[in-house]
Design a protein with these regions (language model features):
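Hydrophobic ligand-binding cavity/cleft-lining segments
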Residues: 2-56
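Extended beta-strand/beta-hairpin segments
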Residues: 13-16, 63, 93, 106-119, ...
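Hydrophobic residues positioned within well-ordered beta-strands of beta-sheet architectures
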Residues: 16-18, 59-61, 74-76, 100, ...
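Hydrophobic pocket/interface hotspot
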Residues: 29-33, 39, 61, 78, ...
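Hydrophobic-ligand binding "helix-grip"
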Residues: 40, 66-111, 119-121
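Short N-terminal secondary-structure initiator segments
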Residues: 53-73
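A conserved amphipathic terminal alpha-helix motif
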Residues: 119-159
């Protein structure tokens, strides 16, 4: 049973659960988060981001992360309902499991509640030891990064 507990601890499922009310309209924040192609232009850790396909409200996107001299890619299938939700599912990458969703709730014409729920598990202990601290810090700050960029876009529209 001791070994089992150790296994559980090492291969635990990791969760991100964040929500913010922001003074940005729903369409701006949804479009920003749904446009995987644009990530590389404002997320400092994102070396490359590509939309491989966008058919019937399902985007296959690939993100390349580069941080602390470590590079890796992962690919997700993102099924979306415009201005409502984006559901993420792992297609390929160093995870045994990754899925989650973004939800968008219109408060009024100028304010939106944005939430991200993500759960993930790495392929093996070695990968987890090298990638978990980086991925965890990225995912814990990703909502803030999107919000900052949404405010920049909003301010550009106003000038």
């Amino acid at each position: 049973s001791c070994n089992f507990n150790l296994y559980q601890r090492i291969y635990s499922v990791n969760y991100i659960d964040k929500s913010e009310d922001i003074n940005v309209d729903i369409s701006t924040i949804f479009t920003l988060i749904n446009n995987v192609d644009g990530y590389k232009s404002f997320l400092p850790w994102c070396k490359n981001s590509t939309i491989i396909s966008n058919i019937d409200n399902i985007i296959i996107g690939e993100i390349e992360i580069s941080k602390n001299l470590i590079n890796w890619k992962f690919k997700t299938s993102n099924s979306y309902i415009k201005d409502k939700t984006i559901k993420l599912e792992l297609v390929d990458g160093p995870f045994s499991h990754l899925n989650g969703e973004w939800n968008f709730k219109k408060k009024d014409n100028f304010n939106t509640q944005v939430s991200l729920y993500l759960e993930y598990q790495f392929d093996n202990r070695i990968i987890e030891m090298s990638l978990k601290p980086i991925f965890s810090s990225i995912m814990n700050s990703i909502l803030d990064s999107f919000i900052s960029e949404a405010f920049r876009i909003k301010n550009d529209k106003q000038t």
